[in-house]
Amino acid sequence: MTFKTVLENDKVRIMRARMDVDAREGLHTHAADTIVVHLSGGEIEDTANGKTVVNHWKPGDVEFEARGSSHSARNVGKPIDVVLVALK
């Protein structure tokens, strides 16, 4: 997954990110409450707490990742572009 910071200040860090087909993010823990806005649709296989689900995202969908939440992810569809807003 590639990340590019587009704005950062004492309140937020805003990043654009792209996850290519079959790209994987290993197990990681979110350091901040993060809002994810999907710019493109696709499918992400998400594993957390021993459970694996495939999420189907459409352009404009929004999700929330809580500070301290842990999971791994794999893109099982087409390339996905998102904007991440991490609250400080």
Whereabouts are the PLM-identified features?
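Short beta-strand His + acidic residue motifs that chelate non-heme Fe in jelly-roll/DSBH
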Residues: E25-L27, E45-D46, S70-G77
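Local beta-strand/beta-hairpin segments that build beta-sheet-rich folds
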Residues: M1-L7
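Residue-level marker of beta-strand positions
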Residues: R24, E43, D61-V62
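Ligand-binding loop in jelly-roll beta-barrel domains
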Residues: R67-K88
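Short, conserved beta-strand element in jelly-roll/cupin
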Residues: T29-E45
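Short acidic-glycine-tyrosine-enriched beta hairpin
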Residues: E8, G50-G68
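Extracytoplasmic/periplasm-facing segments of secreted or lipoprotein envelope proteins
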Residues: D10-R24
